[in-house]
Amino acid sequence: MGRPLPEKGLRLFCLPPAGSGAGIFYPLMELECPELSICPLSLPGREGRAHEKIPHSIPELAELLARDLLPHIRPPYAILGYSMGSLLGYEMIHRWLEWGLAPPELFITLAARPPHRSFGERLSDLDQQAFRQALSQLGGLPKEILADEETMSLFEPLLRQDFQNCENYRVQNLKALPNPISAIVSDEDSLLEIKDVTAWKDCTSGSFQLTTLRGEPHILPPKILKDVIQFQIENTRA
């Protein structure tokens, strides 16, 4: 996180999607929620943790992150998982519960399949041309970056490893979380179907809410991300 955490207010710990890092959540710093602290998390292999080896499974990465955050997990807090980040969040919350910590007030899953549903097409196995075409459809990456061979030679291995971790992850014995879950998905998401996202309701013994966005890609534009998360937080704290 790179900075001291505030003592009061709701902490929203933000877990990024495949290939991304804490920076994708920086637009949330502009949210007009005075009692909310945005806590973007950086993962191994990127940003300030670029020197760290990327774990080769979702559970292994979740274990590492859960232990990193252990000193900071106390009420009130919430988790925002963006795509891959939602799988990490599910695993991390279970670990904190096993270690005797309180659950979050809310678990927000954004553009994410639930842990007991298969990933679908294996993007990590695609050849270079097909893989980059798939990335273009997901949104979030400018065409200039996709066409820059030097940049992609560094970025593509990270993305493929993240996708492979997601593709290989599937929970067989689903354990419901006690906290509410709010799932957000776009009807134009190239990776997901709404019926799959609805299955997040199986992951909680608490309340479940589904929000469907219209016409947005898998990686949301910053303004849409800000608006949808502000709405979720205001609903939770009302």
Predicted segments with their positions:
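Non-catalytic, mobile gating and regulatory segments of ester bond hydrolases
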Residues: 1-238
